[in-house]
């Protein structure tokens, strides 16, 4: 395993299928389909909600009038995790910041050590709730059937070891030829550089066919990929209404939209097959 990629090994813990070879139609390099991880393959948002609700029960926090707990925790995650991606906080620092702000909203003040311990307790509940989305295995099967020799990879914003632990826990590690994480590279989605780094990895290990990227964030994932020259697919699981300017840019770049991985796979087979 390199500093920012995980080599595929025979077998697959989710579907039992072997990792695909690079053979495709005669004279045609195999296509590459890259995925985001959180809320694309893994049901991250659901795990977060289950984790924070369990943590609140254990800490015996009283309800706060007008405070939506899952919404607050999601907003804190967005704010502080993006500060980490921007280099304003360390990985552990963004965790402590989320813990401090959430606890303070419930009347508890935490110093750094206490905030770290608070987050560790929450994280155990979050980790216990990790699950793959129900359409993941079907998507792999459909892509393999419709795109012979298709190669799979992951591009994710986060620390490599943490994201690899998720893939391993979910039984998905075997599926991917390369896993590219922003924490190992120093730049993050939507920077075109991270998408191009992934493409270079695949070019080094086999003939390179057309490359697509599937992710749940329109700007960060689909538009970012399209601006790097990939086919961007926005996995809009929650039927979100995009910002008009981003929607216009997505149309200009040829971004595809799907509400499930089943739909995304059908679109990719149609475009790349």
Please annotate each region the language model reported.
Residues 60-71, 106-119, 175, 207-208:
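Short, surface-exposed acidic
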Residues 50-54, 79, 98-101, 121, ...:
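Alpha-helical elements of Rossmann-like donor-binding domains used by nucleotide-donor carbohydrate transfer enzymes
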Residues 79-121:
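A metal-dependent, Asp-based hydrolase signature
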Residues 12, 16-35, 40-75:
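Active-site neighborhood of HAD-like aspartate-dependent phosphohydrolases
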Residues 92-93, 120, 124-153:
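Short, acidic loop-to-helix structural element flanking the phosphoryl-transfer center
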Residues 48-56, 73-77, 95, 99, ...:
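Hydrophobic alpha-helical core bundles mediating ligand binding, dimerization, or RNAP-core interactions
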Residues 1-33, 137, 141, 153, ...:
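Asp-based, Mg2+/Mn2+-dependent phosphohydrolase catalytic module
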Residues 94-98, 131, 193, 259:
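Generic recognition of short, well-ordered alpha-helical interface segments
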